[in-house]
Regions:
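Glycine-rich adenosyl-binding loop in Rossmann-like folds that engage adenosine-containing cofactors
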Residues: 39-67, 135-174
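Conserved SAM-binding strand-loop segment of SAM-dependent methyltransferases
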Residues: 125-132
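Short, hinge-like loop/turn segments at secondary-structure boundaries
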Residues: 120-122, 144-150, 200-201, 224-226
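Conserved acidic residues
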Residues: 132-137, 185
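Hydrophobic packing residues within well-ordered alpha-helices of enzyme cores
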Residues: 94, 115, 144, 193-197
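S-adenosyl-L-methionine
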Residues: 1-124, 175, 219, 223, ...
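Conserved acidic-Pro-Pro-aromatic motif
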Residues: 98, 103-104, 171-248
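Short, well-ordered alpha-helical microsegments
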Residues: 91, 112, 138, 190-193
Length: 248
């Protein structure tokens, strides 16, 4: 949903108290260290986690929106491709529920070692690519901008630091057509995949976080219009995270 003024007034104070708390962040980083959720353990051996952000691990509000729609909707019928592996939180939950091998993309090389460690320790079956998934063969490299927050590597939020990532054409991925679910947390690149979703005929289920800090009202309207055009209907949402299913 698009946050209106009333929503911001009600939600933002609670968000910063639980999800962005400096004092709790200190406790989590130096005393607890790892992130524990249900029977999962996640190591946080990553640079550039802002100290207040550690409180989201303490209160288990990390990736709350995405987690909710994944836990409510993923089943053993889903064979998932995850864009944005992060610390492995969403991939691990997805694998635990579906039981099916994952394809995971993570463009930030600094996260790969920690991500692999978490996926292995939580007994996931997966194929991990330190590349950028693209729809068109002609796309060779893509520029992504870096920030002081490991969560905010983006092609859309411009900073003075950037990396160029090798693109991987989707048709070069073995058994790609057998995967029916796309899960996207890509700091604005959800627009790219949704814009070109017509080329991914095998994708029947689409989960994504919509970044309102990047997209204006007209951009959001175009995204929703394109989903409708390609027979995707909304089935669930939690704040700015959505689940759409293709209905033919």
């Amino acid at each position: 949903m698009v946050f209106n003024r009333l929503t911001k007034v009600l939600i933002l104070p609670l968000y910063y108290l639980l999800h962005h708390n400096f004092i709790i962040g200190l406790i989590q980083k130096f005393l607890i260290k790892n992130f524990y959720y249900k029977d999962f353990t996640f190591f946080l051996n990553i640079r550039n986690i802002p100290l207040p952000n550690y409180s989201s691990f303490f209160f288990r509000t990390y990736e709350y929106n995405d987690r909710k729609i994944i836990e409510r909707n993923i089943t053993k019928k889903n064979r998932c491709i995850v864009i944005g592996g992060g610390i492995g939180f969403i991939p691990c939950i997805t694998y635990k529920i579906s039981g099916n091998k994952l394809i995971i993309f993570e463009i930030n090389s600094d996260l790969i070692s920690n991500l692999n460690k978490n996926l292995i320790s939580n007994r996931c079956k997966y194929k991990l690519y330190n590349e950028n998934l693209v729809i068109f063969k002609s796309e060779k490299l893509k520029k992504f901008y870096l920030t002081n927050d490991f969560l905010a590597t983006s092609s859309r939020i411009i900073t003075n630091k950037f990396i160029k990532i090798k693109n991987l054409y989707f048709k070069k991925i073995k058994n790609f057509k057998k995967f029916n679910t796309l899960i996207i947390d890509a700091e604005g690149d959800e627009q790219y995949y949704i814009k070109n979703i017509k080329y991914l005929k095998n994708i029947k289920h689409l989960y994504f976080e919509l970044h309102h800090n990047i997209f204006g009202k007209k951009d959001v309207e175009k995204i929703m219009k394109n989903l409708k055009k390609n027979n995707f209907k909304i089935k669930d949402k939690c704040f700015n995270s959505f689940y759409f299913r293709r209905e033919i």
